[in-house]
Amino acid sequence: TLMGGALKVPGNVTPVTEANINQDPEAADEVFRSNLPLTMIGLDVTTRTLLTKEDTKKWRELGTVAGEKYADITDYYIDAYKVTRPHLGGCALHDPLAADAAVDPSLVDTIYLNMKVDTKGAYAGRTIGDETRINDEARQTQAAVNVDKERFVKTFMKHLTDLFAQN
């Protein structure tokens, strides 16, 4: 399971590239073409799993150092999103969703698709179906296209709130 890419939504670095893939499109392309079974948790689903200042307020209300510090860090991230992605209304839980989906694949709905990453030109870093393997019966990548966001965010908040309550 990897966090990276954007299949049907705009990128977060350029209109077509997601930040993790954008760092090294050639390496990402090798991974997608490796014939390893992969699950791609991209912006299509991660930008639906949001934390808001209402969530961080719950951590502050715990009255613990951990709750206060993590609320500060997350609020900073939320404020950054107000500049870069104001339409979202919070900060996306990119990596936590990928980690949780690796443990509980039922969190996401996927489609099977052989993927590639464009490595040259204006679209370098774009994750897209590989037209040279479109008819291959063996499809190696499950690209997440939907997420049970309520269940994920509720579980995420419960785990962290319980942890922060202790410290």
Regions found by a protein language model. Name each.
Residues 22, 26, 41-167:
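Conformational coupling and interaction surfaces
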Residues 1-47, 53:
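Active-site histidine-anchored catalytic micro-motif
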